[in-house]
Swiss-Prot record:
Belongs to the DNA gyrase inhibitor YacG family. InterPro entries: DNA_gyrase_inhibitor_YacG (IPR005584), Znf_NHR/GATA (IPR013088). This is DNA gyrase inhibitor YacG. The keyword Metal-binding applies. HAMAP family: DNA_gyrase_inhibitor_YacG. Its cofactor is Zn(2+). The keyword tRNA-binding does not apply. Residues 43-53 have a biased composition (Basic and acidic residues). Interacts with GyrB. Inhibits all the catalytic activities of DNA gyrase by preventing its interaction with DNA. Acts by binding directly to the C-terminal domain of GyrB, which probably disrupts DNA binding by the gyrase. SUPFAM superfamilies: Glucocorticoid receptor-like (DNA-binding domain) (SSF57716). Zn(2+) binds at residues 9, 12, 27, 31. The gene is yacG.
Length: 62
C-alpha cells in the first residue's frame, strides 16, 4: 500500500503532497517566501521574556 501523504499548506491551506515537494511543508515557493518574510518582519514571535537591548548588562553583571 503506497498512500500519498497530503498536508495543508500552512500559508494558504491548499492541499499539497510531501513526497517530491521541494517547498514542503508549503505548496509553492510563493508561500514559502511569504512565510520567510513574515519571520523577517518579526510578524511571528516566540513567547518568552523580552531579550535585553544591545549594550544592556546581563543579569549578574556588575
Amino acid at each position: 500500500m503506497n498512500a500519498i501523504t497530503t498536508i495543508k499548506c500552512p500559508q494558504c491551506r491548499k492541499e499539497t503532497t510531501l513526497a517530491g515537494n521541494p517547498y514542503r511543508p508549503f505548496c509553492s515557493q510563493r508561500c514559502k517566501m511569504i512565510d520567510l518574510g513574515t519571520w523577517a518582519d518579526e510578524g511571528y514571535r516566540i513567547p518568552g521574556e523580552k531579550a535585553p537591548e544591545s549594550g544592556d548588562e546581563e543579569p549578574g553583571d556588575e
